[in-house]
Amino acid sequence: MAQATITPTLRGDTFASTFTEVAHSNTLGLRNNEQLRLFHLSVQNNHFDHTALVKFLKRNVGRYVFSRAEYEGYKQRDDLEEVALDAVNRMRSQQDGMGLGEILLYVLLEQILEAPKVMSKIELNQARGQIHSRCDAIHLLTPDGQRTTSSIVFGTSSVVGNIGDAITAAFDRVVDIEQNRSDEVQLAEHTVFTKTLDPATASCVKDLLIPKPGGAPVFDTAYSMFLGYDIGLDAKNYDNQQYRSALDQKMQVDIAAHAQR
């Protein structure tokens, strides 16, 4: 039987012009599959291009904040002009200080890992009852040519000035999520019986997490972290080409120093 899947929500056609990937050869040394990817914003005249980032986020903030069912409602009402403003207002009403990290976590999970959103942090906050989610996102990674089992991906984000502090904070949260993994899975299960998910996504999550009579659910859990930190370079000390090279080299050195600590 074909593996059920859910559709991506991100509009990522301008991702490559907004973010620049930095090549490196470091790994975390894990037994299971892993990805360790480095990105920075595109650079113009020794400064990060925040204008491109803002435009990219405006295109996607509604897709991040609202469930597929809610977003489809805007389409049916021919009211997509209101999506971004309504999404920002909902984020402000729930803001916990980590909004940028959470939305960039969503972007990278969908664009790079190709793991569609099940629930964002905003949706988790909306849906929670007696169960408090410790993660910033729940996404679904389905089988491909190498993976034979689906994975529920629990995401967390950490945006602080120092890379070491960002890593420590993120891993502390992963440990907390792992220790309460059954609660996180149960929260995902509960969404199937609410109006939070659209019918197609609810059916996919139900098939994955809730065993049929005489059967058992077959899925793994995985973790994803988004880390944001201050690069610590003084742009005045470099010409344009030197700055781009120094930026890549600094990030390569940073990840090499922390990858397998």
Which residues does each PLM region occupy?
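Short amphipathic alpha-helical segments
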Residues: 49, 53, 97-105, 162, ...
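Extended, Lys/Arg-enriched charged tracts that mediate electrostatic binding to polyanionic substrates
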Residues: 100-133
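A structured, charge-rich N-terminal accessory region that forms the first stable segment of a protein
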Residues: 2-82
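Glycine- and acidic-residue-rich phosphate-binding/metal-coordinating active-site segment common to enzymes
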Residues: 118, 126-207
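Short glycine-rich, low-complexity/disordered patches
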Residues: 67-78, 97, 187-191, 261
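Short, charged/polar micro-motifs that form catalytic or ligand-binding hotspots
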Residues: 43, 47, 91-99, 127
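A short, surface-exposed helix-loop junction/capping segment
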Residues: 77-94
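Acidic, metal/cofactor-coordinating or nucleic-acid-engaging core segments within structured domains
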Residues: 168-260
